[in-house]
Amino acid sequence: MSTTADFQQMLRXADLRVTRPRVAVLHAVHXXTRDADTETIIRSVREDLPEVSHQAVYDSLHALTAAALVRRIQPSGSVVSRYESRIGDNHHHVVCRSCGAIADVDCSXAGSAPCLTASEDHGFEIDEAEVIYWGTCPECSVAPSR
C-alpha cells in the first residue's frame, strides 16, 4: 500500500501540484479492491476530506488520468466511468453484460504494451491496445432468470 508521501511524490514526478484532493483521490483509487466509480471515489475521499466538492474530485480524476497516474475505464454503453491504479501493463477487462461487473484480464503475451499487434498502423505510433471482453459473470450465470 502506498503512503501519502508516495502519492505526493507521484504527483510531483508528473509535474502536478500536490493538493489534498489529488492525494485523497489517488489514495481512494489505489485502495479500491476493484475498479472504482466516481461515486465510490467521492465517498472514500470524503471520509478524510468531508468538505471536498464533487467538482474537485472530478477535476482531480481528470488531471490524474491525463498524467497517466490512473486509468479511466468506460465500457461501451456504460454511463459510469471507473478508475484504476493498474497502469502501463498488459491487461484488459471483462465486463458482465448482466450486472456490469468488471474484472482485469491479463494479456496472454508477455512484454511491453501493446500486447496486440495491428495488421496496419496507418502511420500511427501505436502504444496501447484496449480490449474489452464481454460475457456473464459467475454470480449472474447461476442466478435464476426472471
Curated annotation (Swiss-Prot):
Protein residues bound to Zn(2+): 96, 99
Tagged with keyword Transcription: yes
Primary subcellular site in the record, as a coarse category: cytoplasm
The keyword Repeat is annotated on this UniProt entry: no
Single GO cellular component term: cytoplasm
Keywords: Cytoplasm, DNA-binding, Iron, Metal-binding, Repressor, Transcription, Transcription regulation, Zinc
Pfam families in UniProt: FUR
GO biological process, one term: regulation of secondary metabolite biosynthetic process
Gene3D superfamilies: 3.30.1490.190, Winged helix-like DNA-binding domain superfamily/Winged helix DNA-binding domain (1.10.10.10)
Protein location: Cytoplasm
Domain of life: Bacteria
InterPro entries to which the protein is assigned, alphabetical: FUR, Fur_C, WH-like_DNA-bd_sf, WH_DNA-bd_sf
Alphabetized GO MF terms: DNA-binding transcription factor activity; transcription cis-regulatory region binding; zinc ion binding
PANTHER family cross-referenced by the UniProt entry: TRANSCRIPTIONAL REGULATOR FURA, ZINC UPTAKE REGULATION PROTEIN
Protein family according to the UniProt entry: Belongs to the Fur family.
Functional summary from the UniProt entry: Acts as a global negative controlling element, employing Fe(2+) as a cofactor to bind the operator of the repressed genes.
Protein name per its UniProtKB record: Ferric uptake regulation protein 2
Organism this protein belongs to: Mycolicibacterium fortuitum (Mycobacterium fortuitum)
